[in-house]
């Protein structure tokens, strides 16, 4: 099954013959998945403006125009079910299973650009028929994230808190601050720090970078919205930790690696703008391809990031500027000793990317605006 953002879904056999096609608009960030003989994706009704921006004029659109999950029959392309609770186009939708065997997914509503889906908050959807099991209203919720289950509990971030929600009833069980007096370690110091930080900066409704979160074992990792910091919440104990990281690596042949750190001095550029050199946004043919000035920036702060990926004991955290952090996710303390390596996907300014890393047969696969990349071990 192939899908594009121009309004077409098509299914082909392995010889390339078209089996079926449908004219239907999908969210350009959709993460479709197969469930049995069904193809599940995020369906959208209204398109963005020609400049790629979604205007606020749809904020009061009726339910028929809401963004929804939709399941198609893989054999025919017919609609099997469509949700009614609505979800935000920025959701990273992940199918999961409750302990009673039900296949479910958590979806969220709320965010920037005036999305019409209401109420703001999250819902648990039964993937058997698309029905809503429960909904939890969360006023002011920023839903551009992924939601995972841990022992039948939903783990999510809301404003300055980490919430654990009962996956059976939809009731909030715990609420833990991720911004008030949090232990913070410095990358340059290979030890656990006694420093704490308060991250309540301005009136931000978001406190994590969009779609930067990933639940790995008992740790819920995320990137801060206001600092170049990697954070994690221990969902069993409620412990929160931060590790201050470099903004970007500047690695060049025959020279020692250099790191760019966040400049907080008066008159310094915003976090999202600080780079070794701005991204050129040139593709493999030399054409400049972008519609948002943030694309030239650091990949920290007000952007939608690639979701981290786990392979074995390592968490791979890619940043839009081409830098990739490799973290030992199960480290007892989130400090510099948990950092396995920092590397890049190419030279600074020429390695823009917004995709997660993929893994197969011991190799890492990535792509930037210019290249497809396969990384293998020296032993291979």
Question: Over which residues does each language-model region extend?
Answer:
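Noncatalytic, solvent-exposed loop/strand surfaces
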Residues: 1-380
């Amino acid at each position: 099954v192939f899908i594009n953002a121009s309004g077409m879904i098509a299914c082909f056999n392995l010889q390339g013959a078209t089996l079926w096609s449908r004219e239907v608009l999908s969210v350009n960030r959709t993460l479709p998945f197969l469930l049995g003989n069904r193809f599940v994706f995020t369906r959208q009704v209204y398109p963005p403006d020609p400049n790629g921006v979604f205007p606020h004029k749809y904020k009061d659109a009726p339910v028929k125009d809401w963004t929804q999950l939709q399941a198609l029959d893989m054999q025919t392309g017919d609609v099997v079910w469509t949700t009614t609770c609505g979800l935000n186009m920025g959701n990273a939708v992940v199918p999961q299973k409750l302990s009673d065997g039900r296949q479910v997914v958590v979806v969220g509503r709320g965010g920037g650009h005036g999305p019409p889906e209401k109420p703001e908050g999250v819902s648990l959807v039964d993937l058997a028929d698309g029905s809503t099991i429960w909904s939890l209203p969360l006023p002011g919720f920023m839903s551009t994230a992924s939601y995972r289950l841990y022992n039948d509990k939903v783990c999510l971030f809301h404003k300055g808190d980490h919430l654990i929600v009962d996956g059976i009833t939809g009731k909030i069980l715990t609420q833990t601050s991720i911004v008030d007096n949090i232990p913070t370690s410095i990358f340059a110091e290979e030890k656990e720090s006694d420093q704490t930080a308060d991250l309540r900066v301005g009136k931000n409704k978001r406190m994590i970078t969009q779609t930067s979160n990933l639940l790995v074992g008992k740790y819920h990792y995320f990137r801060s919205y206001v600092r170049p910091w990697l954070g994690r919440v221990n969902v069993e104990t409620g412990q929160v930790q931060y590790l201050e990281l470099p903004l970007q690596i500047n690695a060049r042949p025959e020279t020692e690696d250099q790191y760019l750190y966040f400049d907080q001095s008066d008159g310094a550029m915003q976090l999202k703008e600080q780079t070794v050199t701005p991204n050129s946004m040139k593709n493999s043919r030399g054409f400049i391809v972008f519609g948002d000035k943030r694309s030239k920036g650091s990949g920290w702060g007000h952007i939608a990031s690639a979701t981290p990926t786990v392979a074995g004991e390592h968490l791979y955290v890619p940043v839009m500027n081409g830098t990739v952090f490799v973290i030992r996710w199960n480290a007892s303390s989130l400090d510099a000793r948990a950092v396995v390596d920092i590397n890049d996907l190419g030279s600074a300014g020429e390695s823009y990317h917004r995709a997660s890393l993929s893994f197969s047969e011991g190799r890492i696969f990535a792509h930037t605006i210019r290249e497809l990349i396969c990384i293998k071990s020296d032993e291979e």
